[in-house]
């Protein structure tokens, strides 16, 4: 028998999986803990199915898919302790700024130089930044995640109240993605948060920003590095990347008051404003540029920067100053290493 989700889309609504699952449950062939993972009968799941149906997804297909989703406790454990929240900056940085990751970044750049140059030309995003994001996210496509995306999103949508609204939206987007792209949703793997492919796009980001490099077919961010590169560049461009502008500037602080850093990651005041408050750039920078002060825990005390618009754009990929700094530092290390190999 052809698996339900690998059948052509036009035939999917003619096959029912949920009754089979209900029969299996009724005769006790699935342990209670595992059975608790079937979500299709939950009120919140029914709302997801209704929303998907309004968007054009077959309701039977959506219900069957949610019936196949399994609750994963390891996902709930992982999301409770992300590295950005459990490690100080100097330890977090060491995860990504390794010689191996730098060397493989150079190799990835060399292998895809033509595509990177083309995407950089159309988006304004430097190749090294695109390479670094893919390097931080998945080690250049090597580690893209082992969880079924449907399990991750269903678990977090229905069993993680703290962010249920966000992950419910992502679950709905995933149903649409799988239906529109004619993908087998049970075969798609990703991170514990449901992020997918080389660049770890969430389903809503895929639908909004993923692009096919050659313009043919749905973007394949899972197996096609060209589409992944194009999609990362397009994501940053769409979030306001400014071609040729700086990203972040190191600084010293005369009076490191906690109130100085309470404004968040979005640039809100001019560099001149921050200078007047005692935050002094260590490198030349346009004092009219809008910036946000960044404060991270270094091995010896605190480290400070002024984050400019492009730094903020990187944080739209992952809302963390440490993430953006890791991407930026890795990008500069990769670019420097590649220049050295060219000598």
Regions found by a protein language model. Name each.
Residues 1-5, 15-21, 25-164, 168-189, ...:
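Cell-wall glycan-active module
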Residues 200:
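Functionally critical loop-and-helix segments that line ligand-binding/catalytic clefts
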